[in-house]
């Protein structure tokens, strides 16, 4: 059984082969409305091929995705910039002072 990583890596090639099969189809003798639909199918397949290529490249560039697909432990997530700034602000704030008298109990 192929690994998840190998399956993902093969996607662009598999789609390329499917697109080539459709592009090789001869349909010049088909009626105009059929030819137009098949032209649209070819355009769709070409766009799908480009989209899959970009997505696979993007996914495999992410260390956590590559580690998951290879079955390795995931790298620790780094805190976002907002989380780091919030921690920094909290560490620099002076402790609250009680200048107001405590509310009276009824």
Swiss-Prot record:
Gene3D superfamilies: ESAT-6-like. Residues 85-106 are annotated as: Disordered. One of its GO terms (molecular function) is RNA binding. GO terms for biological process: symbiont-mediated suppression of host innate immune response. Its main location: host cell. GO terms for cellular component: host cell mitochondrion. Keywords: Host mitochondrion, Host-virus interaction, Inhibition of host innate immune response by virus, RNA-binding, Suppressor of RNA silencing, Viral immunoevasion. The keyword Transmembrane helix does not apply. Residues 1-73 are annotated as: RNA-binding. The keyword Lyase does not apply. SUPFAM superfamilies: FHV B2 protein-like. The dsRNA-binding region is required for suppression of RNA silencing. The N-terminus is involved in homodimerization. The alpha2 helices of the dimer bind parallel to the stem of the dsRNA helix. Homodimer. Interacts with RNA-directed RNA polymerase. Binds double-strand RNA (dsRNA) with high affinity. Suppresses the host RNA silencing-based antiviral response. Belongs to the nodaviridae B2 protein family. This is Protein B2.
